[in-house]
Amino acid sequence: DQCNHRIMEWKRDATSGQVLTGGNGEGSGTHQLSYPLDVIVDKETDSLIICDRSNRRVVRWPRRNGTSGETIISNINCVGLTMDENGSLYIVDFGKDEVRRYRRGESQGTVVAGGNGSGNHLDQLNDPQYVFVDRNNSVYVSEWGNDRVMKWVEGAKQGIVVAGGQGQGNGLTQ
């Protein structure tokens, strides 16, 4: 619930939702969020990991009785995130046009897609939005700026266009 600065849980067939995190007004306190954009569940720690966009941070928030979150990554323009089978976190940094992988305990992360400035070359991203990681640790990134989806095989220096890349439109290649 981005504009209400909170994460809601809606159970199947429920008539109302429950506030899980935030809900204390917009702000930068440990009990607040500011325009959260994405959230995933970390099953190992039974917590939520949230892209707290306007606070430029990623926070971990306990799912049970959590009244505040813990900043796990600072100074990042996070718009999307996912986690692989090993518990590594992949975060889209919109401001740097890159995706970084953070293994548990890491604070800097490793660039796994983009990281060469904004652009349309195969080693660049332009306004990346969403990220997905498959079982082979290939990273898929959707780009708003290039109207394409890129696949970056683990260890690759450049990606492969797997969808779009032909400009905006409703054609089968767009």
For every predicted segment, state its role.
Residues 1-21:
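Beta-propeller domains
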Residues 5-8, 56-59, 97-99, 109, ...:
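Structural signal for beta-propeller blades
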Residues 14-37, 64-77, 106-129, 155-174:
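Gly/Pro-rich loop segments of beta-rich domains
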Residues 47-49, 88-91, 139-141:
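Conserved beta-propeller blade signature
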Residues 2, 12, 44, 53, ...:
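Short loop/turn segments immediately following the C-termini of beta-strands
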Residues 42-44, 84-86, 134:
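Structural WD40 beta-propeller signal
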Residues 10, 41, 60-62, 102, ...:
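Hydrophobic/aromatic beta-strand positions that recur at structurally equivalent sites within the blades
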